[in-house]
């Protein structure tokens, strides 16, 4: 069993470093970015250790020569994790909200539901407007579309239709998103 002192996850080593580099000859890039030329792997590792740094493989040339950089691997990993965390934080999450209507909804109820949809749209969410047909109401598809049109007219100043009204089982669904 793998013993870990601080119960952390094992490090997934994507980049070969130091002795884990397989190529016999490597093209070296110094710690400040200048090319030092091709060297044998052992000489390159020794050069990195003299500077108190690590040798990390950053690429491979078609002729089998590995491209390696001298750097502080701990600092490099920290910066990568920080960059990934920042990218994840800046990711925009769009939520789907749903408003349910019926064919014979009253005007005041329709306005109230439209206000709720307006709140969702102002928050940047995508809104699914579902109109449910009960019993024999499914025969009055035109009334359902008319109700959806009335609802959309209440919010059309801040919303645009992403997906037109489509019948799925007993629901007439339409998706709207905020205008940009």
Curated annotation (Swiss-Prot):
Cellular component GO terms held in the UniProt record: cytosol; membrane
Localization, UniProt: Cytoplasm
Keywords (A to Z) from UniProt: Cytoplasm, Initiation factor, Protein biosynthesis
Listed Pfam families: IF3_C, IF3_N
Function in brief: IF-3 binds to the 30S ribosomal subunit and shifts the equilibrium between 70S ribosomes and their 50S and 30S subunits in favor of the free subunits, thus enhancing the availability of 30S subunits on which protein synthesis initiation begins.
Self-association and partners: Monomer.
HAMAP family registered for this protein in UniProt: IF_3
NCBIfam families, sorted: infC
Family of the protein in this entry: Belongs to the IF-3 family.
Protein name as it appears in the record: Translation initiation factor IF-3
Organism: Mesoplasma florum (strain ATCC 33453 / NBRC 100688 / NCTC 11704 / L1)
Gene: infC
